[in-house]
Amino acid sequence: MTRVTAQLCKALLLAAIATFASIAAADPDETDPDLAKRDADYAAGKALADKKDWAGAVLLFERAERRYPDHADLQNNQGYAYRNLKQYDLAFLHYRRAIELDPRHRGAHEYIGEAYLLTGDLASAQRHLAALKNICVLPCEELKDLERAIAEYRGPK
């Protein structure tokens, strides 16, 4: 191998490592972090969700959804707010829509898996755990969180 070829291979390897690292470190709730900059209702809904004002967050997310019905992050956040209101049917509707829009949305797979556990459906939670195992190239927080939730659901061995 020539010196130039070796340097090129090294550069390509470093670029690949950087790409995979950025994928693994991405925030699951923000596959499009610019939506909060573009839409005041979405940003305000996220702020209310951070304060655990789930009903207020839902109202603002619904307004933002009129403008961005096909936004996976928005659907995921709506599902999370509905889940915390214990409105599981609506939570599942939005989580499924997020996954339909972005089948690799790690946050949606984690959150829907946790919602299935809250409704006693371990088998469905395990399906989303399997999806996360396929999605996460490197270990990811969403996979670990859902594994932990399933272990807690099962109880001590």
PLM features: residue spans?
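Helix-start (N-cap) detector for alpha-helical repeat units in TPR-like alpha-solenoids
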Residues: 38, 72-73, 106-107, 139-140
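Structural marker of alpha-solenoid helical repeat scaffolds
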Residues: 67, 101, 134-138
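Canonical tetratricopeptide repeat
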Residues: 77, 111, 145-149
